[in-house]
């Protein structure tokens, strides 16, 4: 098995990889963007980071199989969901997803998004 670090050079806050790819499975660490503004802006900025990491792994949002969305305040769900849904526009099969409230997120973020994807070119 080959294990590969996925990185776009962004800042990390601890001993972890922004993403890891092994045997065609891609895991992205939770993406946050507390500097971006409100929930809508933070959601979009987090998804932009996810797009960049997926591209670094050689895939796109079309290969995302699971998303986990953590919200500092569950009342932000509707705004987050609108931005998230627009991001998925054109994706034939949307990923499975879980979304829930977390008491506190790193850096004072309002939203954190964790992604799992696959690379079907890997192991054919």
Which residue ranges define each predicted feature?
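N-terminal presequence-like segments and the immediate start of the first folded domain
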Residues: 1-65, 71-124
């Amino acid at each position: 098995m080959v294990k590969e670090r996925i990185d776009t050079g962004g800042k990390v806050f601890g001993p972890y990889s922004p993403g890891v790819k092994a045997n065609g499975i891609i895991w992205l660490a939770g993406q946050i963007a507390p500097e971006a503004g409100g929930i809508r802006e933070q959601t979009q900025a987090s998804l932009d980071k996810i797009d960049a990491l997926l591209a670094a792994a050689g895939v796109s949002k079309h290969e995302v199989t699971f998303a986990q969305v953590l919200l500092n305040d569950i009342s932000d769900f509707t705004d987050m969901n609108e931005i998230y849904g627009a991001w998925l526009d054109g994706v034939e099969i949307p990923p499975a997803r879980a979304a829930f409230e977390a008491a506190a997120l790193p850096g004072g973020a309002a939203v954190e998004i964790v992604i799992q994807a696959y690379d079907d070119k890997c192991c054919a």
